[in-house]
Amino acid sequence: MKVITILEPGKVEITEKEMPEVKEGEALLKILYGGICGSDLGTYRGTFAYASYPRIPGHEFSAQIVEIGENDRGLKPGMIVTCNPYFNCQRCYSCERGLVNCCETNETMGAQRDGAFSEYITMPVERIYDGMGLNPRQLALIEPFCISYHGVSRADIKKGDKVLVIGAGTIGVLAAVAAKAKGGEVYIADIAEEKLQYAYKTFGFAGMIKNDSEESLANSVSQITGEHHGFDVCIEAVGLPSTFQNCMDAAAYGGRIVLIGVGKKNLDFNFTLIQKKELSIFGSRNALKADFKELIELVKCGGIDLEKIVMNKGCADAAKRSEYELEEAAAAFEEFHQYGGSKLKVLIHFSDPSEITEHNR
C-alpha cells in the first residue's frame, strides 16, 4: 500500500509498505480524506516541537471500515467514520482522573507515533466514531474542530464576552466559530490579509484585526473595547512567543487567556503583568471523546458548515489550491508551506468509499 512519509524537513515521499495486520480489538480502515494539520506542516518545516523523522503524518482523517470484529459500538464494515488519534496510557495520574487528553505519555498520530496518511490503517475499535451520515470531507475536519472547541471550553465564555482569537489558521478560525457559538462577540487577528478577510466574511465574526505590529494591535484593542479595557477572553492559536504576549497585552483586567497553539520557542516576558491584571491563563491540549461525539452531532444538525474552512474549492492555482490527490502529497506540503497565507485547510484525497458487503469478522 502507498504511504506518505516525511523523511526529513522539506522532504516528502510516497513509499510502499505492507498492509497492516489487524489485531484483536482493532478494525481495518481505508482512508478517504486527510487534512494537513499545522503540526504536520511544522514537521515538514522542522519547527514542530514533537517532530521526529522519518514520520508518517496525519491525525485529521475520515475512513471507511473494511474489517471489524463483533463490537458493542454498532460499527460495521462499510461505515464511514472518523477517529480519536490521541493514544493514552490509561495508567498515569492524568488518565486516572479522566484527563486522558493530557496523558503524561500521550502519543498523537503523526506526532509521537506514525499517522493516518496511508491507504489503510488499523485502529482500536474504541477510538472509532460513527460518522452519522456526514460526508468524508466533513469528517476529516472534525478533529481540528475538536481541538478548537476543547480550548474554547476552557475559557468559560459567557454571552456577550468580547473574545479575541489570535491566529486565522484552521485552529484559530474554528476556535472563533466555537466562541461565537457560545455567545461571544468574536474578533479575529492575523497578519495574513487573505485568510483574515475570508474568515471574517465567511463566518460572520464581529470584526477583524490586522496584527502586523504591536501598535496596530493596541490601537485596535482600544477602538473595540474602549481605552484601557481589553478583551474578556483571548485565545492564542499560533504558538509563537509574540502572539502569547499579544494576548496578555490585549486581555482585560481579570481576563482569561487560552493557549491552543504549539511552539518550540521560549518567551521572555514581564510576568508581573499576569499578577497586575489578575489574568487566568489556561493551557489546552488535544480533545476528549465527548468533544468528538458532540461536534459530529452539531455538524449533522446543521449548526456549523465545516466545509467552509476549505478555501478556494476546485482552484488549481498552486498559491490557492486546497485539495490534492495522494500522488500529489509532496506538492501539497510544499505549496502549503509556500502559500500558507492564502490557504486555511489543505485536504488530501486518498480514496472514495466503496461497496463493502463482507460480514463482521
Please annotate each region the language model reported.
Residues 134-213:
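Mid-domain Rossmann-like dinucleotide-binding core that forms the NAD(H)/NADP(H) cofactor-binding site
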Residues 201-280, 356:
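Glycine-rich cofactor phosphate-binding loops and adjacent beta1-alpha1 units
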Residues 245-249, 289-361:
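C-terminal hydrophobic helical "lid"/dimerization subdomain
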Residues 192, 263, 287:
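Residues in the short beta-alpha loop(s) of Rossmann-like NAD(P)-binding domains
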Residues 37, 75, 84-132:
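Cysteine-cluster motifs in flexible loop/terminal segments that predominantly coordinate metals
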Residues 20-34, 47-93, 132-134:
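Glycine-rich beta-strand-centered segment in the early N-terminal region that forms part
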